[in-house]
């Protein structure tokens, strides 16, 4: 191949290098994104704002039915002694249950003309936020870590749940879950650095 042929390939080679160099940091970004405390804090702030808005509505903005949500209480002594896989299961199942609860409340609100539109906006934001958090945790590897061997699954305690019958209680639980179990788990997973 002559000099002209090599020069013709140079722009193509430079383009390939540029695409490769720009693509590599992006591939690793999602796993680290949840490790940036500002990301989780943004979701916590949105949940807290929604909780504050619903505190002001009459009778806590009744949902008209009980919706099952994860219990957000954390026994720190027990949490420190248990394995990361168990934490992953608790967080993954809790997030799935919260997502179902928010989707259910979204459906209930769609059928109600009595509640202000601002409440619908907060529920919609929560649904979107939970989807984003699920994606971020999936990139961190929580879903894989939450899948445990059969012998571990039989000894694992079932997820503790409570019922929420108002939007206020639902958003309080959502906020507490993010500030509690989710923040604890992501902090540990990011410190381990094995992701």
Swiss-Prot record:
Subcellular compartments: Secreted
Disulfide pattern: 35-190, 57-61
Glycosylation sites: 52, 66, 111
Gene Ontology BP, a term: erythrocyte differentiation
One Gene Ontology MF term: hormone activity
Gene3D superfamilies assigned: 1.20.1250.10
Signal peptide: 1-28
Keyword Lipid biosynthesis in record: no
Record flagged with keyword Membrane: no
Any single Gene Ontology cellular-component annotation: extracellular space
Alphabetical UniProt keywords: Disulfide bond, Erythrocyte maturation, Glycoprotein, Hormone, Secreted, Signal
PANTHER family recorded: ERYTHROPOIETIN
Family statement drawn from the similarity comment of this UniProt entry: Belongs to the EPO/TPO family.
Role played: Hormone involved in the regulation of erythrocyte proliferation and differentiation and the maintenance of a physiological level of circulating erythrocyte mass. Binds to EPOR leading to EPOR dimerization and JAK2 activation thereby activating specific downstream effectors, including STAT1 and STAT3.
Protein name: Erythropoietin
Native organism taxonomy: Eukaryota, Metazoa, Chordata, Craniata, Vertebrata
Gene: EPO
């Amino acid at each position: 191949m002559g000099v002209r042929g090599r020069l013709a390939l140079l722009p193509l080679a430079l383009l390939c290098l540029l695409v490769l160099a720009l693509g590599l940091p992006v591939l690793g970004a999602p796993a680290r994104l949840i490790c940036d405390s500002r990301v989780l804090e943004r979701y916590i702030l949105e949940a807290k704002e929604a909780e504050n808005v619903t505190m002001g509505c009459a009778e806590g903005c009744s949902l008209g039915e009980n919706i099952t949500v994860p219990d957000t209480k954390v026994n720190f002594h027990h949490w420190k002694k248990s394995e990361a896989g168990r934490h992953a299961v608790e967080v993954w199942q809790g997030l799935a249950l919260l997502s179902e609860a928010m989707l259910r409340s979204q459906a209930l609100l769609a059928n109600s003309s009595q509640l202000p539109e601002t409440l619908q906006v907060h529920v919609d934001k929560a649904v979107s936020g939970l989807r984003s958090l699920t994606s971020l945790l999936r990139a961190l590897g929580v879903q894989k870590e939450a899948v445990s061997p059969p012998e571990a699954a039989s000894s694992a305690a079932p997820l503790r749940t409570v019922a929420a019958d108002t939007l206020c209680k639902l958003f309080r639980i959502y906020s507490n879950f993010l500030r509690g179990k989710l923040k604890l788990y992501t902090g540990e997973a990011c410190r381990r650095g094995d992701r």
